[in-house]
Amino acid sequence: MAKVWQFSEAEELFHLPFLDLLYSAQHVHRENFPHNEVQLAMLLSVKTGGCPENCSYCPQSAHYDTGLRKEPVMHVEKVLEAAKRAVELGATRFCIGAAWRGPRGKDLDIVCEMISRIKKLGLETCASLGLLSYEQAVSLKAAGLDFYNHNIDTSQEYYSKIITTRRFSDRIETLENVAKAGLKICSGGILGMGESNEDRIKMLVELSHLSFPPESIPINKLIPIPGTPLAEKNAVDPLDFVRIIALARIMFPKSYVRLSAGRESMSDELQTLCFIAGANSIFYGEKLLTSANSDPESDEKLLLKLGLLREKSKTAVDCSINLGS
């Protein structure tokens, strides 16, 4: 059973001497995962822009003028083409995101078709669609969804400073609905929004208090987007970022810890420290929803230099096969 952490013990770990913290995190990582493997996940926006939420970091919010063009839901065949490309590139997980407060009516039916078709490729499936009821989560599970992503973003105390169109408790309720439906949870946060290290630690503690803690934890570095309220925020301290990666690894020993948004601005050295600290998953590909991602060729070179191997798919399928609908 996963440990329920208290703030004081998590804070004590965070403030360990840096090398001691990384040593502990790497030890935990090696006890629970193949220590030279990295999971490659790919992310596709299947409905872009026009979101009614006012998340201060997000270029897809209808509240801000970021120059982003609103686009309708993608055709299923286009999504399937992207998923096949993901298999060819060596990804083992394919994530779809939609700029909604939550899916409605036929939108959920379309997403369910996407998921069932992607699943036939042998990929793990993940979706990020906003707030979700238990009944909607059950439908996604029946379609073959493995993971549901719903980041809590930051601590409960800091949450209202970055989002006011929904409550922190709404996020938790969706995560509980997802878990109750039998889906695995993917949930993490964003660093660099003006929050303190205390907020970052509390975010991880909150995740440990869920009925079913996340099996996948994305840690994002803020990408300041012109036109959003956080456009001028200062970058997070790199060593503090590594400390949070290490803390996530120790607190959630059996969960994937993913380097997510913001990796395109990280040096090879910073990413290497994150891998030492226990990160074992990255978003791969040129784009993350609407933002630039690290260049795939640069990723290949870094993984080769570090001797890191791609995690192998357990259920890979020949993409030349006609998978039907």
Swiss-Prot record:
<comment type="subunit">
    <text>Homodimer.</text>
</comment>
<feature type="binding site">
    <location>
        <position position="58"/>
    </location>
    <ligand>
        <name>[4Fe-4S] cluster</name>
    </ligand>
</feature>
<feature type="binding site">
    <location>
        <position position="51"/>
    </location>
    <ligand>
        <name>[4Fe-4S] cluster</name>
    </ligand>
</feature>
<dbReference type="GO" id="GO:0051537">
    <property type="term" value="F:2 iron, 2 sulfur cluster binding"/>
</dbReference>
<comment type="similarity">
    <text>Belongs to the radical SAM superfamily. Biotin synthase family.</text>
</comment>
<feature type="binding site">
    <location>
        <position position="186"/>
    </location>
    <ligand>
        <name>[2Fe-2S] cluster</name>
    </ligand>
</feature>
<dbReference type="InterPro" id="IPR006638">
    <property type="entry name" value="Elp3/MiaA/NifB-like_rSAM"/>
</dbReference>
<dbReference type="Pfam" id="PF06968">
    <property type="entry name" value="BATS"/>
</dbReference>
<keyword id="KW-0004">4Fe-4S</keyword>
<protein>
    <recommendedName>
        <fullName>Biotin synthase</fullName>
        <ecNumber>2.8.1.6</ecNumber>
    </recommendedName>
</protein>
<dbReference type="InterPro" id="IPR007197">
    <property type="entry name" value="rSAM"/>
</dbReference>
<keyword id="KW-0949">S-adenosyl-L-methionine</keyword>
<keyword id="KW-0093">Biotin biosynthesis</keyword>
<dbReference type="InterPro" id="IPR024177">
    <property type="entry name" value="Biotin_synthase"/>
</dbReference>
<dbReference type="GO" id="GO:0005506">
    <property type="term" value="F:iron ion binding"/>
</dbReference>
<feature type="binding site">
    <location>
        <position position="258"/>
    </location>
    <ligand>
        <name>[2Fe-2S] cluster</name>
    </ligand>
</feature>
<feature type="binding site">
    <location>
        <position position="126"/>
    </location>
    <ligand>
        <name>[2Fe-2S] cluster</name>
    </ligand>
</feature>
<feature type="binding site">
    <location>
        <position position="95"/>
    </location>
    <ligand>
        <name>[2Fe-2S] cluster</name>
    </ligand>
</feature>
<dbReference type="InterPro" id="IPR013785">
    <property type="entry name" value="Aldolase_TIM"/>
</dbReference>
<keyword id="KW-0479">Metal-binding</keyword>
<dbReference type="GO" id="GO:0051539">
    <property type="term" value="F:4 iron, 4 sulfur cluster binding"/>
</dbReference>
<keyword id="KW-0411">Iron-sulfur</keyword>
<keyword id="KW-0001">2Fe-2S</keyword>
<dbReference type="Pfam" id="PF04055">
    <property type="entry name" value="Radical_SAM"/>
</dbReference>
<dbReference type="InterPro" id="IPR002684">
    <property type="entry name" value="Biotin_synth/BioAB"/>
</dbReference>
<keyword id="KW-0408">Iron</keyword>
<keyword id="KW-0808">Transferase</keyword>
<comment type="pathway">
    <text>Cofactor biosynthesis; biotin biosynthesis; biotin from 7,8-diaminononanoate: step 2/2.</text>
</comment>
<dbReference type="GO" id="GO:0004076">
    <property type="term" value="F:biotin synthase activity"/>
</dbReference>
<comment type="function">
    <text>Catalyzes the conversion of dethiobiotin (DTB) to biotin by the insertion of a sulfur atom into dethiobiotin via a radical-based mechanism.</text>
</comment>
<dbReference type="InterPro" id="IPR010722">
    <property type="entry name" value="BATS_dom"/>
</dbReference>
<dbReference type="GO" id="GO:0009102">
    <property type="term" value="P:biotin biosynthetic process"/>
</dbReference>
<feature type="binding site">
    <location>
        <position position="55"/>
    </location>
    <ligand>
        <name>[4Fe-4S] cluster</name>
    </ligand>
</feature>
<feature type="domain" description="Radical SAM core">
    <location>
        <begin position="36"/>
        <end position="254"/>
    </location>
</feature>
